């Protein structure tokens, strides 16, 4: 319902029970729906393990008003364009999508673009040109992840849908993103030593002779920072924590390896 004020901002008893079950099962991510602010994120954070991530679904105008605090508090956001369009209007969604992707990049947080990306493939074995362009646009804008829902869950052609999306992603990523400097220069910096080291090598990351950036990470923090820069080289993350390895696989350009033999006593994260 457009412009509806949602009054709840606390986890229900069932929510807490579901979260505890997810923790017990070893889930890597918890997704939160219909957020209005960061309160549910902070409450959820107290109930999950340190190496579990939170995905915050952006679905209403209230979340947009508080988006900075939401992005700072969460690990990833999902742009749920269907419900968002109902609340703010379809014509507003494209510019909001671009704005959210840029904001997430500034704070080194991953962003998922979702809803009806290949909707026609629920019933048909080929996509429309508009759908292909929609996927490509999200990639050009800098999205970490593009997502299928009903196309893969209940559609008649799930394999073809995944294949179509994969081909579109690979084809689009070959094209040089001239706006990449915007991402490279927009990362918010502070006195964090990891960020300082990262910024010192950012130009090298765009050197065509550099084939890969190897990130050794206990927490996934360095992988997020490197991914946010959208380097030309592939990013290989090595972590002793299998949950971290799975989480960083959501990030743009990251290939993760779980290595139980690797430990880092000197520093939490580093890269080369």
Please report, for each region that a protein language model flagged, where it lies by residue.
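Single conserved hydrophobic/aromatic residue that forms the stacking wall/gate
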Residues: 262-272
């Amino acid at each position: 319902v457009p412009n509806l004020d949602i009054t709840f901002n606390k986890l229900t008893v069932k929510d807490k029970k579901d979260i505890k079950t997810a923790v017990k099962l070893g889930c890597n991510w918890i997704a939160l729906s219909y957020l209005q602010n960061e309160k549910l994120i902070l409450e959820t954070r107290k109930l999950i393990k340190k190496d579990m991530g939170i995905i915050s679904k952006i679905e209403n105008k209230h979340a947009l008003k508080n988006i900075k605090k939401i992005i700072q508090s969460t690990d990833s956001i999902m742009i749920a364009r269907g419900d968002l369009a109902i609340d703010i209007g379809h014509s507003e969604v494209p510019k909001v999508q671009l704005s959210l992707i840029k904001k997430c990049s500034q704070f080194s947080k991953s962003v998922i673009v979702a809803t009806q990306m290949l909707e026609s493939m629920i019933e048909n074995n080929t996509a429309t040109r508009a759908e292909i362009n929609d996927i490509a646009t999200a990639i050009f804008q800098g999205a970490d992840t593009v997502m299928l829902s009903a196309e893969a869950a209940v559609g008649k052609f799930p394999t073809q849908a995944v294949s179509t999306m994969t081909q579109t992603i690979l084809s689009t990523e070959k094209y040089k993103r001239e706006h990449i400097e915007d991402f490279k220069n927009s990362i918010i910096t502070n006195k964090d030593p990891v960020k300082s080291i990262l910024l010192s090598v950012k130009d090298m990351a765009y050197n065509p002779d550099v084939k890969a950036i190897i990130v050794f990470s206990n927490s996934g923090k360095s992988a997020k920072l490197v991914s946010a820069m959208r380097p030309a080289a592939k990013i290989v993350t090595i972590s002793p924590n299998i949950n971290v390895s799975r989480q960083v696989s959501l990030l743009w350009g990251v290939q993760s390896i779980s290595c139980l033999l690797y430990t880092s006593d000197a520093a939490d994260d580093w890269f080369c």
